[in-house]
UniProtKB/Swiss-Prot annotation:
PANTHER family assigned: LARGE RIBOSOMAL SUBUNIT PROTEIN BL19M (PTHR15680:SF9), RIBOSOMAL PROTEIN L19 (PTHR15680)
Coiled coil: none
Biological processes annotated in GO: translation
Molecular function, one GO term: structural constituent of ribosome
Keywords attached to this entry: Ribonucleoprotein, Ribosomal protein
A Pfam family reported for this protein in Swiss-Prot or TrEMBL: Ribosomal_L19
Protein name: Large ribosomal subunit protein bL19
Annotated Gene Ontology cellular component terms: cytosolic large ribosomal subunit
Keyword Cell membrane in annotation: no
Residues passing through the membrane, by range: none
Role played: This protein is located at the 30S-50S ribosomal subunit interface and may play a role in the structure and function of the aminoacyl-tRNA binding site.
Gene: rplS
Family (UniProt): Belongs to the bacterial ribosomal protein bL19 family.
InterPro entries per the UniProt record, alphabetical: Ribosomal_bL19, Ribosomal_bL19_CS, Ribosomal_bL19_sf, Translation_prot_SH3-like_sf
């Protein structure tokens, strides 16, 4: 691992400690809460759509979300570690066999639907256990930093 990769990994870990990023992939429906500044006021705006691509790696990683707004397709690219992103929430998991879902741009209505990935009870239990473990690790890390 070279120096740049090491620095990027440290920075990413620091940013993840502040705001955890859920595991999601193309095909998943996500809600991205974006901080929008209007004059002096800052508010949070929800942007819900299907993740159609994930690009890059490390600190430069980004993802593209597509939604239909008033009958018009709208796509927005979000850097994963952007300070303008308040939170990311996965609404449903999609079952797709491609990394880039750009073909959805040409489809309308039912043709643009993505089948939902069904989760087995064992996988769900494993995910919940991992979530609890991550929460406990974050709590321990916070307690350790407070003790210093």
């Amino acid at each position: 691992m070279n120096i740049i990769e090491t620095l990027e990994a440290e920075q990413a870990a620091k940013l993840l400690a502040k705001r955890p990023i859920p595991a999601f992939q193309p095909g998943d429906t996500v809600i991205v809460n974006v901080k929008v500044k209007e004059g002096e006021r800052t508010r949070v705006q929800a942007y819900e759509g299907v993740c159609i691509a994930r690009n890059g790696g490390g600190l430069n990683e980004s993802f593209t979300v597509r939604k239909i707004s008033y009958g018009e397709g709208v796509e927005r690219v979000f850097p994963i570690y952007s300070p303008n992103i308040d939170s990311i929430k996965v609404v449903r998991r999609g079952k797709v066999r491609r990394a880039k879902l750009y073909y959805l741009r040409d489809r309308r209505g039912k043709a643009a639907r993505i089948a939902e990935k069904m989760e087995t009870p064992a996988a769900k239990a494993a995910r919940e256990a991992a979530k609890k473990e991550a929460k406990a690790a974050a709590k321990a890390k916070k307690a350790a930093s407070a003790a210093e």
